[in-house]
Amino acid sequence: MPTLDAIQINDTVIKQDGSEFSLWYNDTRYMCENINTMESLKELQSQIDIAKGHVVCTGLGFLLREEKLLEKEEVECVVVIEKNKDVIDMQRKLNPEIMDKLFIINDDANLYEGKCDTLLIDHFEDYEDNKLPIVTNCCKNIQHKQMLYWDIFADYKRYANYQELRKQFVTLPNFTPSQFYKYVERDES
């Protein structure tokens, strides 16, 4: 597992509260990860499971996804697009071994143009209400064969709704219902 620790570089801060880590820039929270919750583990696993070939990830975050991608045999290379240079510098300090294996591009993922087999989108602010315009833009600019974006299973908890979304984003995986619900956090009470 990557090293997670409270650290600050300029206006970018990683804060820790027990098993919860959050990434802040100019007092805006960009991500929060509780390393002990099933929801985040399922979401992470969905991206690992579909990844193959040349993988482009948007948003560097805490390297949880990237470390697992590097371990996967079907993944040839991992390119990460990260806009915030301070996040890149933090991870170089905390996790130099992982960072040395990644190809990091310091750029705005919303403007980046490229090509890959698997596109994994996760550069939203933490409380982003409407991710679809960002996803649409990245899918238009980065040619890819398949993609997922972070929190898709929180946004679309029903299989029928996910299938409707696939009409707009045809490169989303064509999960069977059982595959889909493997990643959805459901209240069983």
Please provide the spans of the model-predicted regions:
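C-terminal substrate-binding/active-site "lid" region of AdoMet-derived donor-dependent transferases
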Residues: 125-189
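S-adenosyl-L-methionine
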Residues: 84-118, 123-127
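Conserved SAM-binding loop of SAM-dependent methyltransferases across substrates and taxa
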Residues: 62-74
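Conserved SAM-binding motif I beta-strand of class I
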Residues: 77-82
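Conserved acidic residues
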Residues: 53, 76, 117
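Class I S-adenosylmethionine
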Residues: 1-52, 179, 187-188
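Conserved class I S-adenosyl-L-methionine
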Residues: 52-62
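Short, well-ordered alpha-helical microsegments
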Residues: 44, 63-66, 88, 112-113
